[in-house]
């Protein structure tokens, strides 16, 4: 189920900002003990990442009726679509855990799951798009 190009490109941009800000934060976080500038960069990148996440939640909410439900009824691109939906749900749950759970025991696990899942989503979205275009052709 093809999306209107303006919404499609906006969604691509939001998820690109999420990926880039998350990856850049990871680098800054690893370097934060080396220099105070890295610590400040990590904080700024986390704010950008959080803001982009809010926009991504809006995009995901719009995608449910505009794309997901229509594709589900048409039985198109189900495996990769369900995978993308589950991965996004896992990212939302782990982000919630990172932000709101104060447990120092759970936090490292939640962080690594969130990071790994985020990079997996960066692979799944282009795959989902490619499979959808191939099925339509």
Residue ranges and their predicted role:
Residues 1-137:
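Membrane-embedded alpha-helical bundles that constitute the cytochrome b-like, heme-associated redox core
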């Amino acid at each position: 189920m093809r999306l209107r190009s303006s919404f499609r490109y906006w969604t691509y941009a939001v998820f690109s900002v999420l990926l880039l800000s998350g990856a850049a934060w990871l680098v800054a976080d690893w370097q934060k003990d080396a220099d105070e500038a890295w610590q400040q960069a990590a904080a700024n990148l986390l704010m950008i990442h959080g803001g982009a996440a809010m926009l991504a939640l809006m995009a995901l909410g719009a995608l449910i009726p505009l794309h997901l439900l229509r594709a589900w009824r048409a039985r198109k691109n189900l495996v990769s679509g369900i995978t993308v939906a589950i991965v996004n749900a896992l990212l939302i749950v782990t982000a919630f855990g990172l932000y709101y759970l104060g447990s120092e025991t759970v936090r490292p696990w939640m962080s690594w799951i969130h990071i790994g899942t985020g990079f997996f989503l960066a692979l799944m979205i282009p795959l989902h798009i490619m499979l959808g275009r191939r099925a339509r052709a």
